[in-house]
């Protein structure tokens, strides 16, 4: 059984790419900015997860987004806790009509024993069709250290900001490799709407299918609180904002 999921790296407890969405974009925020993403997910098979993911962007010669996701989850009748440190940096900036790239890497750990559960590395790519529409493609590698197996990670997402405050996201993602349960390597899907009334706060409502490899349906409610760097201009003024 896969036991961790961080951003695209997938498993049985948590993930964090763009809030509760699994497929990441190539962008990172400005140096000095921070955000707190949190969400609660519940499945038709009684699985459950509660996640908090604080992150900040620092300059260590190059802007790097550092985050530590923590989760409390119920899976296969058992409760558990994990945390997942991750570092992400942009390699090629995104822009309308061109492809941007980034890379991130990290791992997941059992919060009680400190045991290293997974190691992962993912390369997100983003193609912006316009100021209000983009396509995200993810590819990467996951090492499940519990069963000592390696997996290929993949993801495809589409974001459309169809009003000033509403954004639609559709995504398919998963992992390829040998697994004891067939559902672990079957594709996973999510569709959700983000309500973002201002640059500080947003709310996500997401429907998912098989998102932890358990062959169940999921409902997720998530929030993001953003803390921009001092004296920065609003994101919509800077970039056109998606």
Language-model regions: role of each:
Residues 14-242:
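Transmembrane beta-barrel domains of Gram-negative outer membranes and organellar outer membranes
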Residues 5-13:
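C-terminal segment of classical bacterial N-terminal signal peptides
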């Amino acid at each position: 059984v896969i036991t961790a999921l961080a951003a695209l790296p997938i498993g049985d407890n948590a993930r964090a790419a763009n809030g509760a969405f699994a497929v990441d974009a190539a962008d990172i925020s400005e140096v000095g900015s921070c955000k707190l993403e949190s969400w609660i997910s519940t499945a038709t098979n009684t699985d459950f997860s509660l996640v908090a993911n604080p992150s900040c962007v620092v300059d260590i010669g190059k802007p790097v987004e550092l985050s530590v996701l923590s989760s409390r989850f119920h899976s296969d009748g058992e409760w558990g806790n994990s945390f997942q440190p991750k570092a992400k940096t942009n390699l090629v900036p995104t822009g309308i009509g061109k492809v941007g790239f980034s890379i991130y890497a990290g791992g997941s750990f059992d919060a009680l024993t400190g045991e290293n559960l997974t190691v992962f590395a993912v390369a997100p790519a983003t193609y912006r069709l316009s100021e209000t529409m983009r396509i995200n493609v993810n590819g990467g590698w996951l090492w499940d250290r519990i069963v000592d197996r390696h997996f290929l990670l993949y993801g495809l997402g589409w974001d459309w900001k169809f009003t000033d405050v509403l954004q639609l996201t559709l995504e398919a993602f998963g992992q390829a490799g040998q697994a004891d349960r067939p559902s672990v390597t079957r594709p996973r899907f999510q569709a959700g709407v983000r309500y973002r009334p201002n640059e500080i706060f947003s709310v996500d409502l997401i429907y998912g299918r098989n998102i932890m490899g358990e062959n169940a349906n999921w409902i997720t409610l998530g929030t993001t609180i953003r803390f921009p760097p001092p004296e920065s201009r609003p994101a919509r003024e800077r970039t056109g904002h998606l």
